[in-house]
Amino acid sequence: MTNFFDILSERKGQLFSTMIEHIQISFIALLIATAIAVPLGILLTKTKTISEIVMNIAAILQTIPSLALLGLMIPLFGIGRVPAIIALVVYALLPILRNTYTGIKEVDPSLIEAAKGIGMKPFRRLTKVELPIAMPVIMAGVRTAMVLIIGTATLAALIGAGGLGDLILLGIDRNNASLILLGAIPAALLAIIFDLILRFMAKLSYKKLLMTLGVIVMIIILAIAIPMFAQKGDKITLAGKLGSEPSIITNMYKILIEEETKNTVEVKDGMGKTAFLFNALKSDDIDGYLEFTGTVLGELTKEPLKSKEEKKVYEQAKQSLEKKYQMTMLKPMKYNNTYALAVKRDFAKQHNIRTIGDLNKVKDQLKPGFTLEFNDRPDGYKAVQKAYNLNLDNIRTMEPKLRYQAINKGNINLIDAYSTDAELKQYDMVVLKDDKHVFPPYQGAPLFKESFLKKHPEIKKPLNKLENKISDEDMQMMNYKVTVKNEDPYTVAKDYLKAKGLIK
């Protein structure tokens, strides 16, 4: 509990900003969903056949898993708030639509006949009789949609939309329960608070309710517009994959660029896996990110390696990107964050395992746990399987940080790893020698579109200061500080740059 309050004190600024983002995303989605569902619900009361079809479509849309829906939005709308809001609107439609339809249908027919009898036109009957009577039922649907939106909006962080999900994902990535709670508790409180507010609004008279909604809409519009007008100048957006290492290096990029140029850099940590960030770069949702030479050839351009030498692999990756995507990598750093297979030290000693090939001796005793990416990549498990004839059964796939917890608890006994992972040191792991040299070199370098670098040639010099800098040991130690000691990635990055004389 003490650790939670320490984290709260350290990150209160981030908590406030992510909470504001969460509220903005949620309310925009709710307003759009209400603006669509209420008029549509009213129209559907006029025809039973079409109403059933539309209701069924809305119900089907709500059954789509939220992660899948967010993933489907990326090719269509890129990343950020727009696809997140669209996905949330889809989820919010059904309860508002259904309650609007039900509320209007349940209005006493005798009241409608009385309204007709005194000469009320259809629109006036709707606004003066049907909607005021149906409003409590409609507001109940809006309340349900609001709670649903606030909860689902935490997943918006997966596509770079921000919100309290940023803190939750960071906590999962760092294996830090306090960070998870720092995002989860405010999200739950927001759902409760706004449910109470909407419940209070449902008790207002029809006129007061409309006035209150008008004021809320104006406040939201101002809350969105003011920050947009307040932004000045160009801002470079650099993103990082999941994990402490991309966060540290991306913050180094930020510090170096801001130290030597007039540019402002926004860092988006933990935005996802390789394909996600690469697509974000292609669609200009981000300007650049840390990528690795082996990943470029194995996953992005899908070219066979012409050499296993680090320099030649870098040149091949660079030329391949330039030819196929009009992108380029700047100079690479020294460390080689290659894939590896690892076991606990006592397991390795017990079975005399030193190399990947030795695993065939104990294949029946292996309980492998791999990341989804490693298990699926052609330069990951598939390459190991082919080179070593190592066909493993019952492979469990999981998020990167979870596999270390699982092997520490004994649920699995073989994992994929990166050679600079801090957890290798933390959990006393042994990296098995890749005696057939299956894994290519993985040197990290900043990846940008060539067109972006033509607009910002001034960032090349500061970023290239990291050329041939940062050893494997340096990187593992920095990862250890962030992952195990819970130090801030920005501070760790700045301390390293100062220690090496790369900044003042």
From Swiss-Prot:
Is the Hydrolase keyword given for this protein? yes
Its name, as the record gives it, is Probable ergothioneine transporter EgtUBC
Keyword terms, alphabetized: Hydrolase, Ion transport, Membrane, Nickel, Nickel transport, Transmembrane, Transmembrane helix, Transport
Q: How does it sit in the membrane?
A: Multi-pass membrane protein
User: Could you cite one Gene Ontology molecular function of this protein?
Assistant: hydrolase activity
Transmembrane feature ranges: 25-45, 49-69, 70-90, 145-165, 178-198, 209-229
Cellular compartment(s): Membrane
Primary role: Part of an ABC transporter complex EgtU required for the uptake of ergothioneine (EGT), a natural low-molecular weight (LMW) thiol antioxidant. Responsible for the translocation of the substrate across the membrane. Also contains a C-terminal periplasmic solute-binding domain (SBD) which binds to EGT with sub-micromolar affinity. Probably does not bind L-hercynine.
Record domain ABC transmembrane type-1: where: 19-198
Assembly information from the UniProt record:
The complex is probably composed of at least an ATP-binding protein (EgtUA) and a transmembrane protein (EgtUBC).
Comment, domains: The transmembrane domain (TMD) and the solute-binding domain (SBD) are fused. SBD binds to ergothioneine.
Which family would the database say this protein is a member of? In the N-terminal section; belongs to the binding-protein-dependent transport system permease family.
Q: Which GO terms describe its biological process?
A: glycine betaine transport; nickel cation transport
InterPro entries recorded for this chain? ABC_Gly_betaine_transp_sub-bd (IPR007210), ABC_transp_perm/SBD (IPR051204), MetI-like (IPR000515), MetI-like_sf (IPR035906)
Q: Which GO terms describe its cellular component?
A: ATP-binding cassette (ABC) transporter complex
Annotated region (Ergothioneine binding domain) at: 231-504
